[in-house]
C-alpha cells in the first residue's frame, strides 16, 4: 500500500525548491490497524496525499516510518540501511556504536560523528524516542536475517537509539 491509501499520510510542501517533496502534517493509522486486524503485514511506500494542492508528495522513508511508529504507539522501530549502524568512523566498521542515548546525539553531531545522510536518519530516531517509541534500531539490511536476529535473539544488530 502507499501512504496515500486511506490518507495514511497527509503532507504539505517541504521546500519551494523541491515541489514534489513533502513534510508529513498528519498520520491516519486506521488503515494500518485494519490491515493488522485482517491478518496482513502492511508494506508502505513513502508517498503522501497533498493537503495544499491536488496530487501527492514524496516523503523521506525514515521519516514516514518514524511518524507511523509514533502514531501506532510502537515499542520499537527498526530502520534498515546499507551500513552497519552509527559508527564513530564511517570508514571503520569496528567503530560501530552499539548503543546511543538521545542525550548523546548533540555532542555526536558537534564532533562530526553524525554527518551527511545519517543526520536525517538520526533526527527521525530522536523524534520517535522523544514521542514514545522505546527504542529505534539502525541496522544493515544487507545482512542475511538481520531483522530476525534483532527481533528474536539477545545478540542484536546495528545501533540501538534510546
Task: Say what each PLM segment does.
Residues 146-162:
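Short, basic/aromatic-enriched C-terminal tail that caps enzymatic domains
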Residues 1-142, 155:
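Nucleotide/pyrophosphate-binding catalytic subdomain
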Amino acid at each position: 500500500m502507499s501512504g496515500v491509501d486511506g490518507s495514511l499520510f497527509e503532507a504539505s510542501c517541504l521546500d519551494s525548491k523541491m515541489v514534489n517533496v513533502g513534510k508529513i502534517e498528519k498520520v491516519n493509522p486506521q488503515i494500518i490497524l485494519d490491515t493488522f486486524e485482517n491478518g496482513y503485514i502492511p508494506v508502505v511506500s513513502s508517498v503522501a496525499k497533498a493537503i495544499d494542492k491536488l496530487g501527492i508528495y514524496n516523503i523521506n522513508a525514515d521519516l514516514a516510518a518514524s511518524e507511523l511508529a509514533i502514531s501506532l504507539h510502537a515499542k520499537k522501530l527498526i530502520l534498515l540501511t546499507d551500513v552497519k549502524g552509527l559508527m564513530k568512523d564511517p570508514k571503520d566498521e569496528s567503530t560501530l556504536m552499539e548503543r546511543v542515548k538521545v542525550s548523546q546525539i548533540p555532542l555526536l553531531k558537534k564532533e562530526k560523528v553524525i554527518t551527511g545522510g545519517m543526520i536525517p536518519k538520526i533526527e527521525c530516531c530522536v523524534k520517535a524516542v522523544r514521542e514514545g517509541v522505546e527504542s529505534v534500531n539502525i541496522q544493515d539490511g544487507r545482512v542475511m536475517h538481520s531483522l530476525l536476529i534483532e527481533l528474536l535473539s539477545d545478540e542484536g544488530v546495528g545501533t540501538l537509539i534510546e
